[in-house]
Amino acid sequence: MSDLKLGINIDHVATIREARYRLEKLAEPNVLFCANEAIRGGADSITAHLREDRRHIQNHDIVTLKENLNVPLNLEMANVQEIVDFAIEIKPKFICLVPEKRNELTTEGGINAVSHEKDLAKTIKRLKDAGIMVSLFIDPDLDQIRSSVNCGANMVELHTGTYANALNNEAMDIEIQRLVLASEMAHEEGLQVNAGHGITSANLEGLFEVPFLSELNVGHHLIARALVIGLRETVLKFKEKMLKYANN
């Protein structure tokens, strides 16, 4: 098998920023800086989800990332006219079309390519005509693979959330087999196969059984781990500066 690439989803860097500094351009944490730190650590691409409600990533983030990254930008988005038009203007290298509900905490499952095949095909054609490679975020289901092909997608991203949330080994094995079959079929149909959602250090190795994977997209887990791993040093350095108070 070829080397497996890692895409880092930086949405939750923006989540932290928006919780405190929604309208301030110099707010922290800086999304571009954090994206570049991920790249220095070995990230092969950066993913950002521009949601309709703009709860974390904003339009200006996408523009800044596109103009400054030295790795591909993968823009996640719903099939919504306004965001499609924006994407065609910005032209990220990759777009991943995902389902979206306003009341969800995060994307809850794959897009239904079977039910929305005609609408998706129109959007995918527009995006591909603009020189953008298009992926569909789908559940590991063979009918969804067939419809992804019919839509004209270049790639699929297999939803690994059900695998990640499996409560026991038997359930995990069932989900791995679904992913294996979906990946094999997608590969046979000429689609690049990526995977993402809920992937952690604890469940990563189970995915090594899935053939033909090109890239894993991981976000929340790595951002959360970065907070834990980096918090001690950050507090230590801050406290060192505070010691100067006694010397004034």
Where are the predicted features?
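Conserved N-terminal beta1-alpha1 strand-loop-helix module at the mouth
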Residues: 1-75, 80-82, 86-92, 150, ...
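Hydrophobic faces of well-ordered beta-strands that scaffold small-molecule active sites
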Residues: 4-10, 46-48, 73-75, 95-97, ...
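Active-site beta-loop-alpha junctions enriched in small/polar residues
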Residues: 9-15, 51-53, 76-82, 100-102, ...
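N-terminal active-site wall of soluble small-molecule enzyme domains
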Residues: 50-125, 144, 158-159, 179-185
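C-terminal helical cap(s) of enzyme catalytic domains, especially alpha/beta-barrels
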Residues: 66, 168-172, 225-247
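Catalytic cores of alpha/beta
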Residues: 81-89, 141-151, 195, 199-213
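Glycine-rich phosphate-binding active-site loops on the catalytic face of alpha/beta enzymes
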Residues: 96-104, 155-167, 212-231
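Histidine/lysine/aspartate-rich catalytic loop segments that bind and position anionic ligands
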Residues: 133-185
